[in-house]
A protein has these predicted regions:
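Short structural boundary motif marking the start of a folded domain
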Residues: 2-7
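C-terminal structural segment of proteins
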Residues: 8, 53, 57-58, 90, ...
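Structural motif
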Residues: 10-12, 71, 268
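Short, contiguous acidic and Ser/Thr-rich linear segments
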Residues: 12-21
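Short, structural beta-strand-to-alpha-helix junction motif
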Residues: 21-26, 51, 65, 233, ...
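A basic, amphipathic helix-loop patch mediating RNA/tRNA/ribosome contacts
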Residues: 22-54
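Short cysteine clusters
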Residues: 42, 47-50, 62, 97-100, ...
Length: 436
């Protein structure tokens, strides 16, 4: 295994000592390469001012670790030359105060390159609104009138893994198992771990990056379930999950911005154990399970049994999430998923809920209502006797807390109203409201 990280920076091959793998990409770009077009705004992956493009997808360089670039191609605003996104921004007078403009340009560049989703989705992760926003949208529409002015450049990069005491990036499951030990910190996309650097000023050590492990990047569609590898990102899993039910696709579209979804992983969201993680309620409601592995030993755990307390899980030392199994809905089953937050895009949920009824069997799961995402067994049992009895039972299942996002009363009232909405909806398809 190598002791260097290799990637392309604006088509130039770059080798960096693996010891620097735990630095943020933004810090390395500005301090080591003097590429200061990429700006720091929020330092937590929310505002998009630091957007760069990795393999045609936008990422937030403020929380993206340098080591994650191994084997990839990085483009910064300095590498665009005269791209249609830049030309359209100039012609439409899309520059605001200027500080966030490079981030907007890079988000538009990524949208131009991959042409996935809507323009509004592409810009949802860029939050600067200091002056006229309409010209930026106009630029996003106009740039497609122009042809590319540059061609992609590719260079053969090393195919083996990276290993250093501070940072490792294995390429195979065998390499990963050789590196795992109880003190290792497993890294998926870094959308949460990166905050420990930028906000808590931690110096990470013994980090093992999972994103290059081939076996963890598999996504298989079986007749009765999906099997999603532990390193599959939200962006990669979105289409398959959206086919299970439209509500899941709509909910995932609101999980962070495009920059977060491009590198954040479903398994990372699960392992993080946040009580307000957006993916867990719908996965629990569907009856999902986790394949856990340590060495040659494997076991399967239902996701609803995975959490043992606030940000505590059933993972044992040296164990990792190999894959997530997501059952498909049976014919005739009713399902809905809801996300309630103050802001429609790029916001943390106050309440996240999923309701699944198949015949006489009900599975209700909620986030933001307890120390962990959890089922509502009393409400499930009461639902057959009427929605009002089920709503009353929710108050027995959960005793939510008050915080800066919502009061306990608000959370419980919203959860009850969402259950009423599910019961009354003819199609049982959720309408993802901004307000309750």
């Amino acid at each position: 295994m190598r002791s260097t990280i290799e990637f392309l920076l604006n088509s130039e091959r770059v080798c960096v000592p693996a010891a620097q793998g735990t630095r943020t990409l933004l810090a390395w770009l500005r301090e080591e390469r003097r590429l200061t077009g990429t700006k720091e705004g929020c330092a937590e992956g929310d505002c998009g001012a630091c957007t760069v493009v990795v393999d045609s997808l936008p990422v937030c360089s403020c929380i993206y670790l340098l080591g994650c670039l191994d084997g990839k191609s990085l483009t910064t605003v300095e590498g665009l030359k005269e791209h249609p996104a830049q030309r359209a921004m100039v012609e439409c007078h899309g520059s605001q105060c200027g500080f966030c403009t490079p981030g907007f340009v890079m988000a538009l560049y990524a949208h131009y390159q991959n042409r996935q989703g809507t323009l509004c989705d592409a810009l949802a992760g860029n939050l600067c609104r200091c002056t006229g926003y309409a010209p930026i949208l106009a630029a996003g529409e106009k740039m497609f009138q122009y042809e590319k002015t540059q061609s992609s450049s590719f260079s053969q990069l090393a195919q083996d893994g990276v290993h250093h005491r501070r940072f490792s990036a294995p390429r195979t499951l065998a390499e990963l198992q050789a590196l795992l030990h109880p003190g290792a910190t497993l890294l998926g996309g870094g959308t949460d771990l990166g905050l420990s650097i930028t906000k808590q000023l931690r110096e990470l050590d013994n980090v093992v990056y999972l994103g290059n492990v081939a076996e963890l990047r598999e996504l298989d569609d079986f007749p009765d379930h999906l099997r999603i590898g532990g390193a599959v990102t939200y962006t990669e899993a979105h289409a398959a999950l959206a086919r299970l039910h439209p509500d899941i696709g709509e909910l995932l579209r609101r999980l962070g911005g495009a920059q977060v979804r491009a590198c954040g992983t479903l398994a990372g969201n699960i392992a993080n154990g946040s009580p307000i993680g957006d993916s867990m309620p719908f996965l629990i409601a569907l009856g999902s399970s986790l394949e856990l592995q340590s060495g040659s030993r494997q076991r399967t755990v239902l996701l609803e049994n995975f959490y043992t307390g606030y940000r505590k899980t059933a993972l044992q030392p040296g164990e990792f999430i190999r894959a997530i199994r997501v059952p498909k809905l049976a014919s005739g089953a009713r399902f809905a998923a809801y996300k309630i937050s103050k802001r429609f895009d790029q916001d943390i949920s106050a309440v996240c809920a999923a309701f699944h009824v198949d015949g006489k069997n009900a599975r209700f799961a909620l986030g933001g209502m307890a120390a962990t995402p959890a089922r509502a067994p009393r409400a499930e049992a009461a639902f057959a006797h009427g929605v009002e009895k089920a709503c009353a039972a929710l108050a027995e299942d959960f005793k939510p807390l008050s915080d800066h996002r919502a009061s306990a009363w608000y959370r419980l009232t919203v959860a009850q109203n969402l259950l009423r909405k599910f019961s009354e909806a003819k199609s049982a398809r959720a309408i993802l409201d901004l307000q309750p």
